[in-house]
């Protein structure tokens, strides 16, 4: 089922490449560095009533203590350092080689897909691994203004090393690796956004920007990025995050063997950002016994916002 995480995010668009990227030897390349900062109060997280979804006890090891699981899409550090943002050179036709490809590894760990933001090369693989004693199901889509398209939908095997009671416990914190699932990402021409969600646990999301050249970076813990070996010239630089709808771009001129700086300040999105939000009544949809409520205990992480 295509969930509401796709709706409302289709305004995010990157220019479609009308050329095949050409790999060349770059000897006089320059470097682009900078930071991405989120300005304003960090939005409230998405909220999911654990009693309406499977594995409430095990997945409730990370929760707010009132039966809600939170998902904060905005990873922000001190001084507004905006982490897990992709910075990309647009429409670069030739440059350095990709180098050896290592498929992104996405783990289902503690009922989360980690990492939340990735970069994937088009027509190449991603590897997804279940580290939990709970059943997870990958539902992967490509998105654009024209709507989503299913890329693949496969279950994630559970490791046979888990004891049977592990998935029913709020106190089992060991992780064993299930059989890896490898899938090839093949995007429709002009589409660049890949999203993955668990079919059983709606709060498990992972996103990726799909690229056809190696001139990109993912911001670090301090919101910094660096892109090296850029052929001299003038380029458009853009940023991408799955929950930032406005476009941000800069024009930069790269000089031989010199460093150029481009900083981005992103305004906090306004309005209702998500379909799923926490409400004050912790068990708003169903009558839940005190026994079940008492079993949903944040023994691994008590979430706050």
Description of each model-found segment:
Residues 7-16:
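Bacterial N-terminal signal peptides
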Residues 20-305:
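Extracytoplasmic copper-binding redox domains, predominantly the cupredoxin/blue-copper superfamily
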Residues 1-6:
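Bacterial N-terminal signal peptides that target proteins for export
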């Amino acid at each position: 089922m295509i969930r509401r995480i796709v709706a409302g995010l289709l305004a995010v668009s990157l220019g479609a490449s009308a050329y095949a990227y050409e790999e060349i030897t770059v000897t006089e390349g320059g470097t682009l560095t900078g930071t991405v900062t989120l300005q304003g109060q960090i939005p409230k997280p998405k909220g999911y009533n654990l009693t309406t979804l499977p594995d409430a006890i095990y997945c409730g090891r990370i929760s707010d203590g009132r039966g809600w699981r939170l998902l904060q899409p905005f990873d922000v550090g001190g001084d507004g350092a905006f982490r897990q943002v992709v910075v990309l050179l647009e429409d670069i036709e030739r440059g350095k080689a990709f180098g050896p490809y290592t498929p992104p590894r996405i783990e289902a760990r503690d009922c989360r897909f980690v990492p939340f933001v990735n970069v994937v090369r088009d027509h190449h693989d991603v590897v997804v691994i279940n580290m939990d004693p709970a059943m997870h199901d990958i539902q992967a889509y490509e998105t654009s203004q024209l709507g989503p398209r299913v890329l693949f939908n496969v279950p994630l095997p559970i490791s046979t090393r888990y004891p049977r009671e592990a998935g029913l416990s709020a106190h089992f914190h060991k992780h064993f690796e299930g059989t890896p699932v490898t899938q090839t990402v093949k995007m429709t021409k002009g589409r660049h956004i890949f999203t993955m969600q668990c079919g059983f646990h709606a709060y498990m999301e992972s996103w990726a920007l799909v690229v056809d050249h190696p001139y990109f970076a993912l911001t670090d813990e301090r919101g910094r990025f660096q892109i090296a070996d850029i052929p001299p010239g003038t380029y458009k630089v853009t940023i991408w995050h799955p929950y930032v709808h406005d476009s941000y771009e800069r024009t930069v001129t790269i000089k031989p063997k010199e460093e150029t700086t481009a900083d981005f300040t992103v305004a906090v999105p306004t309005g209702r950002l998500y379909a799923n939000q926490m409400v004050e009544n912790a068990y708003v949809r169903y009558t839940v016994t005190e026994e079940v409520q008492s079993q949903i205990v944040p023994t691994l992480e008590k979430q706050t916002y």
